[in-house]
Amino acid sequence: MPKSFSPIPMPKRSGEPDPEDNDEDDDEDGMMKSVEYICGLIDKEVEAGVPIERIVVGGFSQGCAISLLVGLVSRYSGKLGGVVGLSGYLPLGEKVGKMMEERKEREKNTAQTKWFLAHGARDQLVPKREFMRYQDKIEGWEGERVEVKLYEGMGHATVGAEVRDLYGWLEKTLPEIQA
């Protein structure tokens, strides 16, 4: 049973451990089933003839969390055209890094995936510090392929500027198909 409705576990009293490394509240099995479901949708698109480098997955809030996992630890890690994460968080704590290492040992990853990470500086559901924490991790893993936007005054929502920035990123990431 979760301790709170927040996707980010929060300590109850000072002196308790930092929730950054507390992944026991995350439903790893459920999340990985969601990742596999998204991979099944990608499979169908690839079977229909869509080039993998033209497929972008993305989500807002919990959808962001699952999209980040698809981009980092699924069988499509490094192969997608892009991953979009809006106002979300990176679940499973330190397990993600371990899962990535296991995947790299099994497969040669020629990582081409581009990333768009955006967040509201006034988000009270997923605090800015949590965004900065996972942004640093993803930039460390994915390097210069990560574009980051922080919107002052925006809470756990989207604003026109974010949508415009995402649109511009998609235009750069997915150039027109040459007929």
What are these model-predicted stretches?
Residues 40-45, 73, 137-138, 169:
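A generic secondary-structure signal
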Residues 48-102:
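Primarily recognizes the serine-hydrolase "nucleophile elbow" in alpha/beta-hydrolase
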Residues 85-178:
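The feature captures the conserved acid-bearing segment of alpha/beta-hydrolase catalytic domains
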